[in-house]
């Protein structure tokens, strides 16, 4: 009886672990393409002008994000992306600070497993 080759086992584990990671890497990449200073400015402008609460501001952010995503990648890739998001709950989420009644978006967490993209990290 032969023992399993440790290299093969490690490779199998790596392949299994990489699949969702590669999709998350794609999510970060797409989010960085979509989230710009202009995008953040528009969200913050909406928050101030319409005096949105956090739930409304998050909804506004996601609607704008999805519209830009659909425009950027086309419907086929968009459908795969949103299907993955629904399954794993990995929609990008805005991070707000409350300044005495008005919200400011200071960053985005692309998924629950990925790092935050801060407003000041974006190219103007």
From Swiss-Prot:
It comes from Bovine respiratory syncytial virus (strain A51908) (BRS). This is Non-structural protein 2. GO terms for biological process: symbiont-mediated perturbation of host apoptosis; symbiont-mediated suppression of host cytoplasmic pattern recognition receptor signaling pathway via inhibition of IRF3 activity; symbiont-mediated suppression of host cytoplasmic pattern recognition receptor signaling pathway via inhibition of IRF7 activity; symbiont-mediated suppression of host cytoplasmic pattern recognition receptor signaling pathway via inhibition of RIG-I activity; symbiont-mediated suppression of host cytoplasmic pattern recognition receptor signaling pathway via inhibition of TBK1 activity; symbiont-mediated suppression of host JAK-STAT cascade via inhibition of STAT2 activity; symbiont-mediated suppression of host toll-like receptor signaling pathway; symbiont-mediated suppression of host type I interferon-mediated signaling pathway. It comes from the Viruses. Its main location: host cell. The DNLP motif has IFN suppressive functions like binding to host MAP1B. GO terms for cellular component: host cell mitochondrion. Keywords: Host mitochondrion, Host-virus interaction, Inhibition of host innate immune response by virus, Inhibition of host interferon signaling pathway by virus, Inhibition of host IRF3 by virus, Inhibition of host IRF7 by virus, Inhibition of host RIG-I by virus, Inhibition of host RLR pathway by virus, Inhibition of host STAT2 by virus, Inhibition of host TBK1 by virus, Inhibition of host TLR pathway by virus, Interferon antiviral system evasion, Modulation of host cell apoptosis by virus, Viral immunoevasion.
């Amino acid at each position: 009886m032969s023992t399993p080759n440790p290299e093969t086992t490690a490779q199998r584990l790596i392949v299994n672990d990489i699949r969702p990671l590669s999709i998350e890497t794609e999510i970060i990449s797409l989010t960085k393409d979509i989230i710009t200073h202009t995008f953040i400015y528009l969200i913050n402008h909406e928050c101030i002008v319409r005096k949105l609460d956090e739930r409304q501001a998050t909804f506004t952010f996601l609607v704008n994000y999805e519209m830009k995503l659909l425009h950027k990648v086309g419907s086929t890739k968009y459908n795969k992306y949103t299907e993955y998001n629904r399954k794993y709950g990995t929609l990008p989420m805005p991070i707000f600070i409350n300044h005495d009644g008005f919200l400011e978006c200071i960053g985005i967490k692309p998924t629950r497993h990925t790092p935050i993209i801060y407003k000041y990290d974006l190219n103007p």
